[in-house]
Amino acid sequence: MYVIVEINGQQFKAEQGKKLFVHHIQNAESGAVVEFDKVLLVDNNGEVTVGVPTVEGAKVVCEVLSPLVKGDKVLVFHKKRRKGYRKLNGHRQQFTEVSIKEVIA
């Protein structure tokens, strides 16, 4: 059984026991339990239920493993030819690692 759940504007395929890296969740502490109720699709052994826009009564219960994980560094380089203009910016996205404890559908 799996579900498609929307977390912080992104969609994830969630199964019990799976770990996910989601966009940073504010005020989340390690070991805290969080629930996500924006379940868009439920697949129960081939029986598919699609929400309009969400499935009523379905939710995903997760435990926060690590509240702040930094992603890989992305470098953005700007240059204008023949003018000597060069600019380098870097960015590291912040994530929260969660473990899916239970899928209620």
UniProtKB/Swiss-Prot annotation:
Gene Ontology biological-process annotations? translation
* Gene Ontology cellular component list: cytoplasm; ribonucleoprotein complex; ribosome
Q: Which domain of life is it from?
A: Bacteria
Q: Name one GO molecular function term.
A: rRNA binding
* InterPro entries xrefs: bL21-like, bL21-like_sf, Ribosomal_bL21
Q: Which UniProt keywords apply?
A: Ribonucleoprotein, Ribosomal protein, RNA-binding, rRNA-binding
Assembly and interactions? Part of the 50S ribosomal subunit. Contacts protein L20.
| Protein function | This protein binds to 23S rRNA in the presence of protein L20.
- Tell me the HAMAP family matching this sequence: Ribosomal_bL21
Supply the NCBIfam families for this chain.
Answer: L21
Family under the similarity heading: Belongs to the bacterial ribosomal protein bL21 family.
Protein name (database record) = Large ribosomal subunit protein bL21
Q: Which organism is it from?
A: Parabacteroides distasonis (strain ATCC 8503 / DSM 20701 / CIP 104284 / JCM 5825 / NCTC 11152)
